[in-house]
Structure formats: C-alpha cells, structure tokens
Amino acid sequence: MISRRQLLAAMASTPLVSMMGTGSAHALPNNDYKALVCVFLFGGNDGFNMLVPNDNAHYDEYAAARPDIALPQASLLPLSLNTGSDLTLGLHPSMTGIQNLFDSGKMIAIANSGVLIEPSTKAGLQDGTHAMPPFLFSHNSQQTEWQRGWSGSTTPLGWAGRLMDVLSSDTDTISPTFSLNGYAQLLNGSDHSANLIKASSLPKVNAVSNSLRRKSFDQVMSLSPLTAFGREFDRVKDDSISIRDQLATAIESVPEEAHFPDISLSHQLHTVARLIKSSDQLGHQKQIYFVGLGGFDTHANQLDTHTQLLSALSQSLAAFNQSMEASGLGDKVTTMTMSDFGRRLASNGAGTDHGWASNHLVMGGALNSGQLYGQWPSLILDGENDFNKGRMIPTTSVEQIGATIAKWMGVRTDDAMGYIFPNLANFSVQDLGFLK
C-alpha cells in the first residue's frame, strides 16, 4: 500500500504553479543557515582529464598512459596549489570560470576519490584482504553507491537524507531537501522525502490563467472521498498543495538573475539560488540540494564532448558562486561534485571506458583553499594505484568527503556521524580539513 509520505512526494513533484502574489520582499537566511549543493555528473566524469598534472615529469606519466586523449600540456590552465610535492596541476582549458574560483580561494580539488568500503590497496583487493565495493563500473549501481554513502549495504536511504535526519528540525513543515534533477536516493531520509522541482516548470503564466486553473483544480479536488484511501489522499493533497504554493511563492519572491547562462545545469542552480535566498520564508536553517548534468559516459568522441560538458559545468558553477557571493551567502553554501565513477586511464581510441576513482571539486566561501586534498596517484598503467586496465583505486572515500561536509553542517557527535556514515570508522582520517 502506498504510504502517505510517498503520496506527498508524488504530489510535490508536480510543476510549481503559484496562485498567490509575488511582490513580497525576501529575507536572507539567518546566521545559523548552511546549505549543501550536490552536483551529480551523470555517466562517469573523466576527472584525470579535468584536473591534469602540469609539471614535466608527472605530465609525461599522464601522457604515456593515454596518448590518444591526453590534453596538450600548453593548453592547461595553471593552478597554484600546494600539493606537498613537486607535482603541479592544471585544469582542462574549457574551465576558465573554475580557474578563477581556484585563484580567488573559492574552489578546491579532492584527488583520486571514489566509492570504498575500507582503505584498499591493489594487493589487498587481489587477495581478498580488502573488501571490494559491489557492482563496480556499473552506472546505476555506482550512482546509488555514491548517493547511499554506505557501500556494501542495501539501505534505501541516502547519506544526505540521513544527515538531515540528524540536523533538521521536528517543526519543519516542508522538507529541507530538494532535487532539481528528479529522484535522488541521496536525499532519502527516515523522517522526510525530498521536494522534487523542475526548474523549467516555474510559473510563467499570467494571473488570469493561474486563477482559472486553480478554480478548475479546486472543483475537481472538492469531490468528497468515498473510501479510507480517498480520505487519506485528500489529506495528502491538501498538504501537497500547501507545500507547492509555499515553494512557488518563495521562489517568485526572489528576482531572476540575468548572469546565469542558458544551460540546463545553470537553470537548476538558478532555481537553487532563489530557494536559498528565500529559505527564511520556509523556516529552514539547513538545506540540501541535488542538481545534475548528464552526458559524461564518453566511450567515443571524448575530447569534443568533454570540452562542452566541462565548459557547461564551469560556467554554471561560476554563475552560482557569483549569486551567492553577491548576496553575502558565500560562506554559508558549499557545493560539491559527484559522479558514477572516473574513466580508465587507457583510452579505447577516441574515448574511455568505465573506471573507478576520479577527481572532484568543492566550491564555497568556507574553504581552506590553496592546497590539493587527498592523495594524487601514480598514473603508471599497471602500477600500484591501477586496479586493472587503468582503473585507479580510490585513496579517499565518499564517506570521508561527506563526513567533512557533515561536520561543517553541524554534526558534532560520533554516534550521529556513525549513523550517517556507518563505514566511516574504517578510515583513520575522518575530517579531510577542507572546510573551516
């Protein structure tokens, strides 16, 4: 039997149409406010063509591993990061917006990260000493593993949902989690379901049309329910309409910003920005958002496709950061990338096949910036970090990244952190230190 929560989630996923005025001024979030924005790069982003070694020795190692798709060294956008060694790094040439964010201290990179159950070595994985995450290299499974944050389990909950189980207030009438990219297990909690919003479904029709639609809808919904299920649906419908109207009103209270480019990810982040700026109306002190960009399964024509995708990512993140900084919210909002997995170092010609570890980005005004986080691997094929055929073994786990963010969001006890990330105890370093 469908639950009340499932009904509410389904109703809340309908396009937002406000029947209320839009002229009220919005209030900025309170001083305790913090938000996490998760950007999922669907398909498996090639993080080693996004963040590339730039010194001669490490670049030669990189180019030897992937001669058909290596970026020209002269094209890389240089980064001034402390790597703890003679390694220097550069960005893909399409990411000038993100280069500027690195230069201004609003962006950091986490090297060679991915899904793990415990710290793992090549030898340990080969002889069974170290546990292998299930269904590696499978899109659906690894998207779930990243979002679940508890590799090896079958829980339907996500780590961000569990985080909000700990942090959200019992008085919240609207869930503090939002997906702008459809269903996301990441946001599933024990106590709440995510609000599903389509950026393209924001109210665009005039007041008369809104009024006529609402009148017709009210007439249909006023019919008396004849069964217990009908009565339950009626209650859920009323809650859902109220939530929908509150969200639409909150979004509409914040003016649109012209600097967001006409890109799908940017549209999603534009809506996120408007919701964040109106969070005080919703009564939230903590919020989590999920957005996504697809197309990263680059088995062919990778150089051209990846250039377009990374340009879209760079432009969208730069616009979102500009919006947060202009509103004085830069240090209250942290944005992170996720992806199914990385790509194999060895190419299949003009593309790459499914890998394991990748490099990831974190953006915001609360960063301890200027250094590389995580451990840069050896890119030698069949070397110590190569599980097989150029699939890099992660040296930093999803749990370590998430726990660092959870601590910044306000998680203070070991019990709470253990509920959110049950595998975290397997890792000696549980706070990577990239947030203040």
Task: Set out the residue ranges of the language-model regions.
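Feature for exported/extracytoplasmic and membrane-associated proteins, marking the mature portion
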Residues: 2-326, 371-436
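Active-site lining segments that contact anionic ligands and/or coordinate catalytic metals
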Residues: 286-288, 330, 338, 355-358, ...
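Metal-dependent active-site segment of extracytoplasmic phospho-/sulfohydrolases and closely related
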Residues: 323-349
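Histidine-centered active-site microenvironments of extracellular/periplasmic hydrolases
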Residues: 339-372
